[in-house]
């Protein structure tokens, strides 16, 4: 697994190393990019002889190329400011001129970053649109500076064409090569132009014997050779390529072969695996296999995978097939017959046979080599099986899952004393009953929590009719006790003993209210109004696991009508109580930081382009600032 991890890391790392010198996009609000733009704009304003300076409006594009030298290439938009060229102000201290009269422009620049974090301009082209007038183009090129240019620049066309012709004319390769991809290009202004280009070449289907130079019918071969070249060209002032040199590295292609002619008597040819031509050759092959094999049973050809024939001084057959063990033994059968059936779990062989036949001499020379196929590993392991993924089967411990109602029933049988004596429950829950009827029946009973689960059991409390539980609201602290206390479906007074009246009416009953920091409404319905309570008691010999949700029959007890009515409800297998007194309420706003989820993976940083528009500082005229307070008198402030 460690080896696989290392290989994956290397596969991710190698492309990144190969692309180290490629241009990387930058955020248009990047500080270092702004410094480069500042240098370029100051250089442009310094070249103006009259008029106003230009102020940065917005950076629209930005790339960075790291290598032996670091270059910044970017585009930015400018607007005419209200500071003159001779004012001595920097462009940051100027405001925009009125939009109707102001000139606008866009500049494309390439700057080199030096070791002292200073920038030098390699090239800059600005297209200026006056407020009223045609576009004016201003170009600047650093004399003697080698700087990158666009690989799509039209000026590279003649240089690249000459580079490919130079390679084809000075190599001994049998085929012509064509231009693949231009990876980078640099230019230097001298008494002419120097170019440094890195490009790839690919082999075409045109041979040098048939084509003296590249033709429009020459297309790159998918599996042909390719290479990468570095070329240096010099173009004089007359736009003529006066010098060129290159160095290339070759990468051989995969599965490169020449197509054989259709009529080739001595060449191997593929034949169908079900061709009748193979019948005799297959017969000799299986006979040779059974003769050389010491196995007690005969083998029979099951599948022919591929076959070729070649005309030599006779015919040579090369066949690959799979042979399987049959039920016919060599002791009881003199030879293999067609009615011999193969064994379902018999041995299988992967065989390669060479059969040389000379019919006019009745000469047959078969040669068979076989390898045993391990069928057991194929049967036991599914496709894609890996020993690293073999599951470890862990025998689970024997345990018994017991539901709360079953625990109560067992406790009754083990401790009969609980049936008669009162059980004091400390259910610290005071609920306010909202009654919809004048008479509401209350039942004192011993059940699980509050309500009648069984006539006797753990806990006790009042039981209300199911129809009267449509509106309930809980006031006060809702204290939960972990052992034998709590409330179930029925809500009532948790204090008291398990003795009381069978029936009583209480129309105007005042319940004691307890002030609480929270008021939580409890919604109940006549159809589904069951809240399960986990009861922890004496359960020696049982292992309590969270059971699956299962229906529980809840008895409403004997009413005045004299019959028992059962209600089926779904009981939650887990404790639905929440210890609100231990966990404080945290009110979270939807837009707050705590409400937002944290991603498992870091978000990909997106490059923001174009950048934020520049907001110049309004520069006021000093004369106006002094005249604003010229009429101020100190006596006015003292009066």
Curated annotation (Swiss-Prot):
Pfam families assigned to the protein according to its UniProt record, in alphabetical order: Cystatin
S-S bonds: 28-609, 83-94, 107-126, 142-145, 206-218, 229-248, 264-267, 328-340, 351-370
The biological processes this protein is annotated with in GO are:
blood coagulation; Factor XII activation; negative regulation of blood coagulation; negative regulation of cell adhesion; negative regulation of lymphocyte proliferation; negative regulation of proteolysis; negative regulation of T cell proliferation; positive regulation of endothelial cell proliferation
PANTHER family given in the database record: FETUIN, KININOGEN-1
Q: GO MF annotations for this entry?
A: cysteine-type endopeptidase inhibitor activity; protease binding
Give the protein's recorded name. Kininogen-1
- The signal peptide, as residue positions, is 1-18
List residue numbers at the site (Cleavage): 387-388
| Sequence positions bearing Phosphoserine | 332
Basic and acidic residues: bias regions:
503-519
Q: How is expression of this protein distributed across tissues?
A: Plasma.
User: Where is composition skewed (Basic residues) in this entry?
Assistant: 482-502
Listed under GO cellular component are: extracellular region; extracellular space; perikaryon
Which residue intervals make up region (Disordered)?
438-462, 476-547
Positions with biased composition (Polar residues):
522-537
